Amino acid sequence: RTVVAVPSRTLQEVPAGGSYRFLRSGASEHRGQVYLLAQAVLGKHVHGEIDPHIWHSVPNAKASVQVIRDALTSADPTGASEYATRTEQVMKELDALDAQLRQVYGALPEAARNLVTTHDGYRYLASTYGLHIAGFVSASASGEPSIQQRQRLRRTVEDLKVPAIYLDKSTAMRSPVLTELAREAQVRTGVLYSDTLDAQAPHYAQMMLANAHTIALCSGASSG
């Protein structure tokens, strides 16, 4: 039974070196090669775009924990019971986190569900929690967006009545375009965590909750 059809053109050579050893298949058919997909495929999350930020969906995090448990059990069978116990504990914590997030995002006004950001890394967040990626402008040193791109993004903000524009935590200081756009459109700016942690959000759950509370605060909704 075919679950996901993977085209042969995605088969790529695995780079030499020990750092990539884990990618090498033991099967003789594709030894030294690996299927390089556009994004991680977990369950129904198939967006057709490059988005490695699977952790922005708690169900994806749960799937990752199970993969880690299985890998540890395979490498260390004597610890199987301990890995299973710890996994069960983590799963309960993730279920509680997921419930909190759904409560916060579920209370958002419709317009606040449209995200305009500096980082196209929130598609799993959007698909899991009922949000929509309305637009983004990457904070890149390689060049500024064109006038047409800026005008199009501003129309998006105005037409959808987007209450805020979100900057990425790691590139907030390099996001003058969106900061200026927010000022012109007279909407708020918020800062979201993408792939970093800090003293305010040193752990996964705190990072996820911080993003949810930021979006709720910028929308004018109470995050509890």
Language model features with spans:
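Extracytoplasmic metal-acquisition and chelation regions
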Residues: 1-224
